[in-house]
Amino acid sequence: MTGRDAAPAGPALEVVEFTDPFCPWAWGSEPVLRALRRALGGGAAHRRVFGILFDEDEEPAPDPAAEAAWYGEFVTRVSAHTGAPRPARLHWVAASSWPASLAAAAAEAQGPRVAERVLRRLRESMFVRGEPADTPERIAAALRGVPGLDAAALAVAALAVAAASAPVRERVARDRAETRAPRPEVVGLRGAGPHPGGAKEIAAGHRYALPTLLFRGPAGCRVVPGWRSAAEYLAAARAVCPRLPAVPDGRPDPAELLRRHRSLTAPELPDGPPPGAVAVDTPGGPLHLSPEEAAVSPLLSAS
């Protein structure tokens, strides 16, 4: 799926990730996307686009409990494919993706490590605890103890009542619009399951399936939608940027991975967790926390 897009400024390769904090396929893809970022290293510019899976203008469900049960079953089916943890019970469906997306976008101003941890905590609120952080109060609780996070600055930037015209909201609004202008290659795309990634039909047209990655480089653009392997992502990156450096051989050290990310799932640890990891058990498999993360994680606090 090669286009004629101009090569980006800066690094020769740009990777654009369309995602949402509460998308189960995006949650399950995190191990592969982390591996992709490690493989590309500093040779790529990464940009995350928040697609707003649950929009704020949607009508509330007439039976919230039934909706939560139905969506929980969907999460269970996705988890069976991805190997990602899932909650024993989804207590509610997120009322909107906007508050969490605003928080995740605002966190980017505090650096990539903080931004990654914020998005991870938001995902864990839904896919481990079963209580999606979809309000400012729930977001604040989910982010308690994130190392390096200036929670007050995040609240001012993303969660204030008067944020409708703030730069962060304008950015996420652009993200939403970009997600709803998919490239023609994915409109009408059909393929083998479980998630081939064809653009989703919506009332206003189409939006990208989540996750979808765009790779832009000197040789054009490729779009890689849906549930994909690291090899497929790397092949697309090399197709548009043939001079990418070789990917280092060997698996990353599990202890170093846990130290860096503080939270890992079973697909990232094929040989098991390193010593000292703290397991949070779920019906979809364990989430492994570093001792430092376990000491502050809301997942281990009393309900």
What are the roles of these predicted feature ranges?
Residues 12, 43-45, 276:
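A generic structural signal for alpha->beta connector loops
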Residues 23, 61, 65, 94, ...:
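Charge-dense, low-complexity intrinsically disordered segments
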Residues 1-13, 299-303:
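Short, low-complexity, intrinsically disordered N-terminal peptides in bacterial proteins
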Residues 6-12, 48-53, 76-82, 113-118, ...:
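Short amphipathic alpha-helical segments, especially helix-boundary/capping motifs
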Residues 17, 30-36, 124-303:
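C-terminal cap of thioredoxin/glutaredoxin-like
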Residues 24, 56-59, 222-224:
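A generic structural signal for short coil/turn motifs at secondary-structure boundaries
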Residues 28-141:
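Structural alpha/beta surface segment adjacent to cysteine/selenocysteine redox centers
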Residues 7-35, 49-51:
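Local sequence-structure signature of Cys/Sec-based thiol-disulfide redox active-site neighborhoods
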